[in-house]
Design a protein with these regions (language model features):
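Short, charged/polar surface micro-motifs in flexible loops or helix N-caps
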Residues: 32, 45-48, 68-70, 113-115
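Ligand-binding loop in jelly-roll beta-barrel domains
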Residues: 91-115
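A short beta-strand-loop-beta hairpin characteristic of the jelly-roll/cupin
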Residues: 49, 55-83
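Short acidic/proline- and small/hydrophobic-mixed sequence motifs that coincide with surface turns
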Residues: 34, 79, 104-106
């Protein structure tokens, strides 16, 4: 049996460090996969930085759908992001996302367990 939900009906919730907001599109308990963790839609307001963080035993895929800015990792690697870019953050790699513009940025985040 399948399930349906309209994304407009999903409530916004805060993110780590209150540096943005997100919608939990699919959570682990809504699937039967032992590796799937979550799929969210994230929002980072203009001029805000999503602070350096990591995901223990979680691989995170980030797809930019709106806006531009900078992504950094703990080793100092810096990449600009723009609409259409895809990033993969391996488990345990600290990273931050900075919206250094005057417009909101939006992303899909997909997370899988590493093991």
């Amino acid at each position: 049996m399948f399930s349906k939900v309209n994304l407009n009906d999903i409530q916004l919730e805060g993110t780590l460090h209150n540096s943005g907001s997100r919608k939990m599109l699919v959570s682990k308990d809504q699937t039967t996969s032992k590796y799937f963790e979550a799929m969210t839609y994230g929002y980072i307001p203009a001029g805000v930085k999503y602070e350096m963080h990591d995901h223990t035993n979680i691989i995170e895929i980030c797809i930019v759908t709106k806006g531009s800015g900078i992504i950094r990792d703990m080793e100092g690697k810096t990449e600009e992001y723009k609409v259409g870019d895809r990033f993969i953050f391996p488990s345990g790699i600290k990273h931050e996302i900075e919206n250094n513009t005057d417009k909101e940025s939006e992303f899909y985040f997909i997370r899988f367990q590493d093991q």
